[in-house]
Amino acid sequence: VLVDGDLTYDPVVAPMMLECLIKDKLEMLNIARIGAKGSYRKGHRLGNFLLTKTVKIIFGSGLDDMLSGYRIFTRRFVKTFPSKSDGFEIETELTVHSLEMKIPIGESSAKYEERPHGSVSKLSTFRDGINILLLIIRLFFLVKPITSFSLVSAFLAITSIINGWLQVIKPWIDNDEITKYPSVIMSSSLMVLAIFM
């Protein structure tokens, strides 16, 4: 059982969730947060929604609360998980690992309470959000190299064609001369990069 130690998650549901993991033959059970008013800041809620949606689009996750700090795993899952993160990116790494391995995962939900009075969250909305987004991009290139490099290659080729047409070919057709040599070099370089990407 993995749970954030900030007293915001309900530990009482852990045995029931463990039974659910065993009964449904899951390797990982994510416990989505049902927040009381004021327990979950709007910026964090929006960031969680956007990052979870990004992982769903790229990796096909079925989770609705990817950044929940309450999960239950089998021993086998823990032994196969090569943890590389040391911050709030760990939840993303766990989710992507389970999707990459194509193992059965599930999601349930439990109450999420306000932090105890006087305790302060270590989560920095922007810094940690950017770190998680960079991890998603890095994992996209590691887990799906053909798709990711093909997208970069297509972007470079399209940029090369548009720049070449607007800055080089069209002016050459209209004026019968090439005046923007830097654009020629740039378009050519982008196309070479696109081909060899």
Locate the predicted segments by residue.
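Short beta-strand-to-loop acidic/aromatic patch adjacent to the donor-nucleotide binding site
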Residues: 1-8
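Short beta-strands and strand-loop turn motifs
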Residues: 2, 30-33, 107-110
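Short, intrinsically disordered, charge-balanced linker/junction segments flanking boundaries
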Residues: 4, 24-27, 194-197
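Glycine-/small-residue-rich active-site loops that bind phosphorylated ligands and cofactors
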Residues: 9, 35-38, 140, 157
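Acceptor/aglycone-binding surface of glycosyltransferases and processive sugar-polymer synthases
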Residues: 11-88, 92, 113-130
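Hydrophobic helical membrane-anchoring modules
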Residues: 85, 92-197
